[in-house]
A protein has these predicted regions:
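Alpha-helical segment proximal to the catalytic Tyr-Lys
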Residues: 124, 167-172, 229
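Residue(s) in the substrate-gating loop at a strand-loop-helix junction
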Residues: 139
Length: 250
């Protein structure tokens, strides 16, 4: 990809899954990469897996002060942040009628408020510097209806509209896009689905499989590169054809 060598990239939720694969991909492209994650064991594991990292920083993204401190530390480690991969998120599989106020608040706080905190702090930094790219992890859950994830779905739809609004306000200095993966075989997915459930999902996807985290990472790398210099305000699905069929593919 053109223009990624030497870019300073901060990946949130970067200790596992899509985040870890994305951190690895940017390192392959010659970027300087810092990973943000709240999980201490995860941060230690990713440091061992990717020794070329510029560093790791800790933060609960739902806490504004922690986000500010972590972003400042990432800037200290790398000198600046040119690209933000705003990826941290959680999900809970539960029936809509049984969602507690505490569960609702937790998912909203991490997946939407946390994305806003990180995006706003990074955007101020980038506007001051005159350029930057913010890429956010949405989901096909924010595009199609899915049962048992009402709170998660609401946050991902929110991320999509936040992305569009940011792109309009931050242009021309800062580009903002979202990536909306479909089913991705990540540790979070494995924890929530049995083997039988995973296979049932595969049969609903036209390509008959889950995405690999590395495939999502490749799209992030492209969108951050000079090859995508005219891309902003867009949501890019990578879902094996899932949304092409709408309800028919569910």
């Amino acid at each position: 990809m053109r223009g990624l060598k030497g870019k300073r990239v901060l990946v949130t939720g970067g200790a596992s899954g899509i985040g870890a694969a994305t951190a690895a991909r940017f390192l392959e492209e010659g970027s300087l990469v810092c990973v943000l994650d709240r999980d201490a064991k995860g941060r230690e594991k990713i440091k061992n897996q990717l020794p070329a990292l510029a560093g790791t920083v800790a933060a609960d993204v739902s806490d504004r002060k922690q986000v500010e401190a972590a972003f400042s530390e990432a800037v200290r480690l790398m000198g600046a942040v040119d690209v933000l991969i705003n990826n941290a998120g959680i999900s809970i599989r539960h029936n809509f009628l049984e969602i507690t106020p505490e569960e609702w608040d937790k998912v909203i706080a991490v997946n939407l408020t946390g994305v806003f905190y990180m995006a706003q702090i990074a955007a101020k930094h980038m506007v001051e510097r005159g350029s930057g790219v913010i890429l956010q992890t949405a989901s096909t859950n924010g595009i199609l209806g899915y049962p048992y994830y009402a709170d998660y779905n609401a946050t991902k739809a929110g991320v999509i509209e936040l992305t569009r609004s940011m792109a309009l306000e931050l242009a021309p200095k800062v580009r903002v896009c979202a990536v909306a993966p479909g089913y991705v075989l990540t540790p979070m997915q494995r924890a929530e689905y049995t083997d039988e459930m995973l296979e049932a999902v595969n049969q609903k996807v036209p390509l008959r499989r889950h995405a690999k985290p590395e495939e999502i990472a490749a799209l992030f790398a492209y969108l951050a590169s000079d090859d995508a210099a005219y891309a902003t305000g867009q949501v890019y699905t990578m879902d094996g054809g899932e949304t092409a069929g709408g309800l028919a593919s569910r």
